[in-house]
């Protein structure tokens, strides 16, 4: 089902793998590769062959030409002719440049490898950072594993890497394992197997080499092989039913490479302290013969103490080759290891034929990767591949789908993103390191998601003292809720994966205070086992990457769902498969690709708006674009005026003009209709008897809403000497009809002014007060409202320089003269708002009236009010709303469906919603500055709508099939 939802069709993981396999090489290509391999083997000396077995360390950071590390790297490549390098920390361009440099220096192409368990970001900055494998396991969706493998391989190849040391095929069924933990997909061997297969196929589809690790399984160990030799005291039956299951699946999926682990398994290898990586019984007999693997075998790093505590450099290299390994990874001394191998051949312990077998596999992989023809990477292509929006969108989608809510006492979550009652939040970051930046991104994300909350922050890490903990506990008493973000990660060689004791004691004391505590595990999911008491809410996020922290901040405040299922058991607390589900209730910010749109197409919005500003269609604009559950574009352009320094932002407040009609007056009418207080077919005089003058007695509410009431479009009261609110009211009430009601449609401000008075009469409240209490506050539109006249406000985007009536720049007061005479509050104009606030309103409309966990409007009410009432006489008019014109000009452009509904405002504002595509486009401008005579904006509205519609690539959800070519 999940695969179907992701647009991959209802395929099994096996069929997904078949779909993903690259096309078979032609017979000629296979023959050409084989000839090249044979030719190299024929010409290589024994010493050169041995050199091909080594993969050495390289750093993708800048190093001067005389840097000792760089010089040693070059020496090993040029003199020892090593077969490959393994890149560690670096940045994209530096690594790619160095990879090209080293390839040029090497006689044979180098096989370049890298650890990429959570993307290239595991080693290289500014690349796509994916959630850890256990997070993918929590989604239950192998399509995500495939996508991560594919994207990681694409980015790796762009940076000169061919072999990925990923995925981890270990089954993490030991809560105290200090080194695997979230690096594994879970504790169920069949889930792990499915995810491993998908990842391997994704890597292969992108043209790279996957390497499953750590054979025969590092998941149920209590020792880190970086520090010592872990022991797996299990019999063969246990290994067959647990540890070996994912490796069998990977081999069945055609994995090209396997990494053997430094693991002691007495049931398979009785020799004391002999790890699997050096054991012929395990590497050759089990992996190669019994499991039928004939690909490349790579040892885990030979510099790790799981080997070095028991074997010297030379002996370890010889034993690895005796065992059946092909690549000797990170030997501490290549020269000594090579000498030992030569000596072993001289004494008959090893044969040259044995060396040839491994070198042949290495060369075959290099040829398969086409390195014999092209070994360099194109630096100009890196920005087109690495960390691009589609890749980041996949990371974000996985992070969101993985979030696992295991405890939610008192329904403390979700928190309202716009609180009706002020609540003080304290965010405490608990770190097992000394990095002062820990938690900063999460706090920033919370402030972006919920800017109305006062948020205090504290960091407690390994440097903290007793006084620091005491101070935070005191601070917590002054807050309403505490969010604790626990950053406890797997760290090679640390030998631990637990909360530091001081952190544990602090958490227990904090929970004992009685304030609600939300604990989020950004890393080790087992940390709750260290506590004596339980927090109100416990969220497992598995990872500490930006996408995960962003997703967690959204989910805490209802902007993302909780749907992940625990892929492990937390003994005494939670079972595998546990996970409470909470839906998303308010819109979230997202990458366009997350809702079936292309970022590349939406980037053209920038060009359109910037060109319009240059052509003086308007000084500034704010745009909000949303689809499905997300806002994908929220941006300001230009300035308040052509000569001002103040820039437009999504929070800039605009005069909405006639958008007031739909956001306030029509919405209020919908609410009163649902409450049974407003009969659409009742005459207006039922609610407003004084309206029954000069033939208007039979005008209905429906006719006011559909602009078929027979009323004049407007009257220029300010030019007629009618400049008091009461005089305007009396003039409208006594006005005569200009056509028979119901026979035609003439857009009328007067009808919506009257409807505003009807709403006030029914509710007993002024229109602005009703809207604040029943529309803006429930929708979280905190910067929306009517504004009194006579109080200019320079923080509001200005409209016109009025040279006729008010004789000043209109800024912070309603532009419409009639609304201004009426005191700034009217049913047709007067509302001020932001693109961000209107996006919440539009979200509610495309979400069938639901927002914030409540039904704000019924779906059938929305359909009633947004469907044309009488195409013959009312044209495209619905109730309050306009709909898309089937022909001719439409501000909704050419492609919005005929079910689309929207409205425009005289000041240069517009809102269009397409329910078929679950799409909305909001454009706010001040095109009337400096004068209303400017009409250039009329071309911008449909052009924007067309650009947005053309960005659609599928249903409003992540479509992996469309994103992964």
Question: Over which residues does each language-model region extend?
Answer:
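Active-site-adjacent structural elements in enzyme catalytic domains
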Residues: 92-111, 140-158, 360, 364
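Short, gly/Ser/Thr-rich active-site loops of penicillin-recognizing serine hydrolases
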Residues: 350, 355-360, 364-372, 456-464, ...
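Preference for extracellular/luminal or secreted protein segments
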Residues: 10-75, 289, 310-590, 598
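Short, surface-exposed loop or secondary-structure junction motifs
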Residues: 641, 694-898
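Flexible glycine/proline-enriched surface loops and loop-helix/loop-strand junctions
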Residues: 180-181, 268-269, 381-384, 589-591, ...
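Active-site SXXK
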Residues: 603-610, 623, 629, 652-682, ...
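Second-shell residues forming the walls of enzyme active-site clefts
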Residues: 45, 85, 95-110, 120-122, ...
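Short, conserved catalytic-motif segment at the N-terminal edge
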Residues: 594-656, 677-679, 686, 693, ...
